């Protein structure tokens, strides 16, 4: 409404006499000529007089639009005044040659000034509306061209792909969260059930420990049991890994230590240890020196006495007190029979055969007592190292025990009454096998002369 009021006020000012007077004064000041009659009087005279012979000009909207294309703003009052001023031709009067007179507008013939002004205003306003519609149409055309371009299509395709990927990732994350929540719920249910079972067991008193031992002792016992189980498993693994090696050694060894009916007979710890036992030079030297001294005193020991002495050693040795881990050393003490150095060759061969038969009988008895248990314990003792362990080395007490237990010593004679003669006879009743090459050879003792009897390694003279 404010714009319309301005338009009407500008039109009124354009057609008011005050504005015309001011315009005439401005024109007189510029040209130096004063017009006598006013414009209204001329208009009245022209309206009373007949119209001139000039043809009226037609109103063309296109010309107005072209003229106003550069001006995008709505028309102002100054433009309307200028248009009205330019449209009205000025005809000089005949009375005063320098006076400028305004003529009636020939553009709107037969119409009043108000109608002509209204037509002009409508024309200008319609041109403004047409320019605005053209501007909007140009914007739409540009937008359409931009949307139909290849760059826009590529961007739209990339945007759609990104949206699809984003939706897929969101669905996967949602599914994973649901699965994790379900797993957590299932785990919590299991924990609750386990806790409920533990509480029920505590209420019933099933897991109550009635022992008076402290917690540290109970834990120590459990730890010792666990360590014993692990040692047992290591021993079994060691025995299984060395089974083929011992089997090959038993096949290539002396057949006296084999049992054809039982292929695992030679698997006890005693035969394996005797087969792999190295020579102990210091102990052999001591035993040989003791044997030499005893042989110089008793040079007429026959075959039966040697066998009896071996039997006494086998029967009296298990009665001697020893620790749990000293058993292999005790076996070493009475399963390494020294051979008399002053006997002839035939008595030495028979003595070796008797000792072999006695060893085989004793090993058979030990094997009958514990077939699997002894093997496992022996494998456990050998699990530390495949060579001779440190605990198998004879100690001072074992060496001291070896000296009086020699077949020619005094201790064996004192313990002669405690031996089992029946068992000795039973052992000696087994048939002896023919002499075979011994797996171990002892060094020959030096030549000794005593009582007119000369004993050498081969024969006596």
UniProtKB/Swiss-Prot annotation:
Its main location: nucleus. It is found in: Nucleus; Cytoplasm, Cytoskeleton. Residues 114-142 form the IQ domain. Residues 310-345 have a biased composition (Polar residues). PROSITE patterns: IQ. Keywords: Calmodulin-binding, Cytoplasm, Cytoskeleton, Nucleus. Disulfide bonds: none annotated. CDD domains: IQCD. Residues 1-55, 278-461 are annotated as: Disordered. GO terms for cellular component: cytoplasm; cytoskeleton; nucleus; plasma membrane. Residues 141-158 are annotated as: Calmodulin-binding. InterPro entries: DUF4005, IQ_motif_EF-hand-BS. GO terms for molecular function: calmodulin binding. A motif (Nuclear localization signal) lies at residues 425-432. Binds to multiple calmodulin (CaM) in the presence of Ca(2+) and CaM-like proteins. May be involved in cooperative interactions with calmodulins or calmodulin-like proteins. Recruits calmodulin proteins to microtubules, thus being a potential scaffold in cellular signaling and trafficking. May associate with nucleic acids and regulate gene expression at the transcriptional or post-transcriptional level. Belongs to the IQD family. This is Protein IQ-DOMAIN 2. It comes from Arabidopsis thaliana (Mouse-ear cress). The gene is IQD2.
